[in-house]
């Protein structure tokens, strides 16, 4: 008990120290930014920025009306040029605060490592060992497991690589500062930080031109270079070490694998095609081979083990003979010589697979390329086995073990690129292929049973529909061209280069069969459909995107064997927008997030938190169904059934500016309409966040709970008890309420009303805003009732403090955004407006730390 108390006391001191450093770092970064602004912009604008920040902070601390008036007067008196400077200052300050908070999160994580808690990977691994789970069960779970973060690009991506690079440097300097003790060290660190902050201020935050798909590919690769290539092998190796007493001599399978939609996601993006897919896979492979070659070069320097000191396996001696380096000075260093030969062969592999990769080959190099990643792994494993057998176990962990894990995980492809297209595009392509193949009917006009019959019959035919001698539309050539590119990339870089074909808007079985038929046209489906020898290269993955389609999904999934199904311990999830930079720009933060993801997946499989007995579960699910139906009715009534709601949305949010002002390669909507149904989910949510309503995150819950409790007064008390029991004992419901609590903490109806005035139709504006305000009150009351407090995020004080600290600097940006959007829509043509509006979008997204 004394040890536990001592550990707890030590952790409390460490956490207090981390909080002190957070405050000091934020103050320091603010001072450095002020200095950078003063040097570049001069005293006048520097004073205005300081006055605005102080007035905003004073208003939020005291809610003083005079402070509010002072702030409004300061903002109203800004010229457009000064507005740009103020927005940049507020936005960059929040960027810097985010860096300090990320470091604080890392330090808290370090404090907790000695006392593992639920949700941490160390805690989960400890539970696995203490639970006495049979080794075979653990082994089979890990062999079947798949945890795959999938990086995506979206219309709301607002970060520039140049800015991310500088911020990464600032984060590194802040982290180094924490370990410094001498005044000289701290002074030098401060000078370096000042240089980085000044560089940040003098760097353009936003791009002049629209982001291309190639830009998005290159941006994503920076996270592999900084984080994934290093962190994922480390995690896998450390898990293997932690479980060594449970799974002795068992090599941990590479269950943590990266995915990407960038370069392969065609749904609504006309700029993605076979060429972008090839370039995505190619650039990934170049990044990967450069990493492998760098690691091998480092190993050659490090493993100068001499046979004059220790023994070595004969297999390593044989490998050493493949080296071009036969210097007399290194004849007793077989590991180094063997690695030299492996390096040459890997370089030959890179040059074969990527002839335009800029590889430098020695004139006397005559090494054969490796055919597969497994062929590369074999000699490295031979070296590891020899080291292990000859007192060299400690030499494996620092680099060789991680390189082996990296190759087993990343292969020759780095990340699996998914391809995605909408089901209506597939239908159009199949219709044209059938017509050009001589079928005198309109496939698109048939009912579902007729379509299934035609598709199954075609899948049994040995001939292809597509003919090189026929003329097709650009759409057909593009879609077939993408699948041909898939086949080429798989043949060159292995089957993991492209594995999934995702179908947006899946509604029926024919949507899946159409993709099977298209795969056949490109050589990705072989054999006779329905027979034992059928081979389908790409998993056909449906996306069910409406309530009705989700309810019909079991019928579709049950009929189609090629559909990808995920069992226990498997999850693929998309990471997009600012979430990628928030989670993965820093390798320490990236590791913490990946460990949390692994822990959650293993916990859900081995130690499910939901231990409800069946009767109680059915009762809870019945209540949830009732709440869901009422919430959906309320939400749809507002969004889809209220006359003028689309006009309200398009006028009172920055959705049009997001679509126009260079925020990504992908259009914000699938079609050029002003229909809610045609919007993408991410811009929809992003736009509501910008105007501080975050409506999709909470609207409908209040009505659902209010109706559930008030429907029958005689049952109100019992129903409330049921909801409180669900909140206390059902993780699903608890998480739902906690998430809504967080969204409400970021919502501000006073700010949102400013945006509402962008709509000139006063009657429509008041009608819709009043409905939103009424539902907001119902939802706030419901969450307060279930959580037993009126304080937002009472159980998450760190997040609550972070949000509270952001609001003073967020409100002025919202105010300025409304003003500039109004001027832009009124026809002002000053280029500074087009420059300033995206700055506010970036600053607000950065402050909210989400993009929808």
Residue ranges and their predicted role:
Residues 91, 383-386, 501-504, 540-543:
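Short glycine-rich or small-residue beta-strand-to-loop segments that form or flank ligand, phosphate
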Residues 344, 348-355, 416-417, 422-513, ...:
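Active-site cores of enzymes that catalyze phosphoryl transfer or operate on phosphate-rich substrates
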Residues 532-537:
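A conserved P-loop NTPase coupling/switch region
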Residues 515, 540-543, 552-553, 596, ...:
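Extended, hydrophobic alpha-helical segments in both membrane/secreted and soluble proteins
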Residues 203, 538-541:
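Extended, compositionally biased low-complexity polar/Lys-Gly-rich tracts
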Residues 2-456, 473-475, 569-852:
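Often metal-dependent polyanion-binding catalytic scaffolds in large enzymes
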Residues 233, 261, 499-500, 541:
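Structural motif
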């Amino acid at each position: 008990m004394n040890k536990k108390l001592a550990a707890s006391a030590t952790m409390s001191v460490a956490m207090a120290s981390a909080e002190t450093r957070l405050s000091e770092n934020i103050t320091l970064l603010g001072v450095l930014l002020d200095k950078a602004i003063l040097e570049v912009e001069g005293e006048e604008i520097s004073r205005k920025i300081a006055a605005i920040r102080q007035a905003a902070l004073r208003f939020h601390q005291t809610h003083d009306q005079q402070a509010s008036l002072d702030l409004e007067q300061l903002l109203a008196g800004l010229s457009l040029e000064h507005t740009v400077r103020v927005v940049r200052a507020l936005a960059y300050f929040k960027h810097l605060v985010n860096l300090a908070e990320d470091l604080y999160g890392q330090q808290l994580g370090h404090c907790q490592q000695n006392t593992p808690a639920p949700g941490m990977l160390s805690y989960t691994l400890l539970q696995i060992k203490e639970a006495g789970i049979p080794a075979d069960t653990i082994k089979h779970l890990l062999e079947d497991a798949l945890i795959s973060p999938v990086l995506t690009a979206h219309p709301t991506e607002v970060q520039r690589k140049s800015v991310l690079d500088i911020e990464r440097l600032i984060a590194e300097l802040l982290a180094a500062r924490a370990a410094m003790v001498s005044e000289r060290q701290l002074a030098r660190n401060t000078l370096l930080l000042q240089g980085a902050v000044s560089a940040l201020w003098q760097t353009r935050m936003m791009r002049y031109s629209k982001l291309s798909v190639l830009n998005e590919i290159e941006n994503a690769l920076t996270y592999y270079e900084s984080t994934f290539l290093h962190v994922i092998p480390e995690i896998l190796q450390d898990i293997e070490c932690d479980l060594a007493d449970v799974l002795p001599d068992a090599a941990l399978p590479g269950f943590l694998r990266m995915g990407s939609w960038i370069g392969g996601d065609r749904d609504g993006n006309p700029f993605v095609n076979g060429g972008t897919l090839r370039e995505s896979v190619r650039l990934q492979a170049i990044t990967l081979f450069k990493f492998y070659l760098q690691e091998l070069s480092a190993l050659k320097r490090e493993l100068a083990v001499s046979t004059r000191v220790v023994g070595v396996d004969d297999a390593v001696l044989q490998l050493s003979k493949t080296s071009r380096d036969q210097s007399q000075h290194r004849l007793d260093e077989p590991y180094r010589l063997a690695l030299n030969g492996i390096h040459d062969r890997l370089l030959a592999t890179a040059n074969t697979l990527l002839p335009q990769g800029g590889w430098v080959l020695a004139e006397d190099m005559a090494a054969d390329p490796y055919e597969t990643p497994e062929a590369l792994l074999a000699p490295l494993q031979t070296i590891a086995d020899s080291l292990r057998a000859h007192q060299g176990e400690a030499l494996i962990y620092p680099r060789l073990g991680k390189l082996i894990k990296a190759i087993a995980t990343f292969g020759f492809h780095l990340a699996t690129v998914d391809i995605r297209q909408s089901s209506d595009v597939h239908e159009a392509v199949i219709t044209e292929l059938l017509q050009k193949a001589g079928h005198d009917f309109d496939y698109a006009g048939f009912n579902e049973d007729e379509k299934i019959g035609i598709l199954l019959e075609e899948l049994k035919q040995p001939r292809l529909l597509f003919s090189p001698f026929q003329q097709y539309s650009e759409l057909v050539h593009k879609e077939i061209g993408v699948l041909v590119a898939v086949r080429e990339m798989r043949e060159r870089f292995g089957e993991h280069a492209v594995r999934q074909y995702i179908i947006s808007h899946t509604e029926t079985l024919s949507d899946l069969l159409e993709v099977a038929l298209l795969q056949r046209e490109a050589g990705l489906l072989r054999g006779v459909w329905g027979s034992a020898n059928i081979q389908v290269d790409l998993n056909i993955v449906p996306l069910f995107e409406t309530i009705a389609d989700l309810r019909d999904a079991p019928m579709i999934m049950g009929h189609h064997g090629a559909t990808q199904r995920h069992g226990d311990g498997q999850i693929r999830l998309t990471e997009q927008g600012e979430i990628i930079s928030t989670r993965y720009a820093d390798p320490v933060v990236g590791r913490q997030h990946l460990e949390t993801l692994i822990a959650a997946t293993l916990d859900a499989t081995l130690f499910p938190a939901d231990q409800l007995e069946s009767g109680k579960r059915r009762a809870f699910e019945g209540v949830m169904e009732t709440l869901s139906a009422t919430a959906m009715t309320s939400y749809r009534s507002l969004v889809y059934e209220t006359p003028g709601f689309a006009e309200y949305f398009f006028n009172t949010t920055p959705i049009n500016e997001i679509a126009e002002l260079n925020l990504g390669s992908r259009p914000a909507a699938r079609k050029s309409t002003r229909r809610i149904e045609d919007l993408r989910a991410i811009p929809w949510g992003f736009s509501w966040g910008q105007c501080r309503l975050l409506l999709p995150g909470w609207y409908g819950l209040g009505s659902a709970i209010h109706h559930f409790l008030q429907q029958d007064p005689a049952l109100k008390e019992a129903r409330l008890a049921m909801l409180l029991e669900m909140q206390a004992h059902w993780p699903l419901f608890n998480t739902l309420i906690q998430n809504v609590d967080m969204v409400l903490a970021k919502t501000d109806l006073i700010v949102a009303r400013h945006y509402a005035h962008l709509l000139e139709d006063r009657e429509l504006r008041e009608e819709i805003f009043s409905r939103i305000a009424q539902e907001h009150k119902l939802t706030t009351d419901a969450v307060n009732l279930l959580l037993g407090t009126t304080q937002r995020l009472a159980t998450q004080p760190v997040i609550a403090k972070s949000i509270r600290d952001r609001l003073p600097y967020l409100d002025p940006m919202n105010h300025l955004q409304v003003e500039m959007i109004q001027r832009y829509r009124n026809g002002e043509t000053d280029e500074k407006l087009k420059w300033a509006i995206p700055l506010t979008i970036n600053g607000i997204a950065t402050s909210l730390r989400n993009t929808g």
